[in-house]
Amino acid sequence: AGSYSYDCYTTLYYGNASKGCLWAVEKNKKDAQAALKTYLYENDNLVEEAGWSTSNSYIHLLDTKKHTISGDIRVEGDYRFYHDNGDYTSGSAPVVRYSTSRSAAERMAVTSYPTNAKGETYGSYLDRNTVGQAPDLIAAMGENGVEGYIRLNDIAPELFTLEEIRQYQAQVDANPVIPLYDLNGKVIGSFVRGTTQDLAAPDPVIAQKLDQMTGGKSANFLPSAQPIPVKHDYPTTANGESY
């Protein structure tokens, strides 16, 4: 990534409630700008996503909220590593998997998506790299365990600059709930996107690992839980107040 070199990996913390974490560590301990997003799946359904988190350090991490799940559990994430000239290197971290079933079959590679009556593609967000793009409708488990689909533009719109990422996340922080649909576009529930506020209480296990990596300085590297203010195109007074 430009003049930087990263180790990027995911970890799954499995228990009565499970969570995932995406890590990116600059090998030479050089501080740099990065943006991360982490996903937790149950049986191909997206159940938790940690909203975009940006930071400027040599250790970047982002964990999802805990979720009680079973079956085939997977964690993965997306990253943006920014170069000094403003360009960036993007990609997806390797998937970590755990199955609660001893007889679980290996997941087959998907190379194309089916379409609904409206011509919209649908499937798991896990398959976006093998297919070459994400589906229009992403398989997800919403509130109260309702299974359905969320729209790609609601969960992963095209973003390029750090400012675009920050402003998208600011909108999510202000209004995290999005509709959950059936295949025909009927609203059947809701899905809660990850917010910056979710990071207010650091996970003790992750903080302990970070302390081991940094000699007890985990507080310097934990992601910020301070919500990003939404920018408005309102004029302002001399005191900076919008009107």
Placement of each model-derived feature along the sequence:
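Low-complexity, intrinsically disordered tandem-repeat tracts enriched in small residues
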Residues: 114-117, 225, 236-238
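Mature secreted bioactive peptide module from preproproteins
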Residues: 1-112, 136-141, 150-156, 169, ...
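Acidic, glycine-rich low-complexity segments with interspersed aromatic residues
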Residues: 158-160
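Glycine-rich loop/turn
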Residues: 117-148
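N-terminal prepro-regions of secreted/extracellular proteins
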Residues: 1-14, 212-227
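C-terminal partner/receptor-binding element of secreted or periplasmic proteins
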Residues: 93, 101-108, 172-224
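N-terminal post-signal-peptidase region of extra-cytosolic proteins
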Residues: 162-166
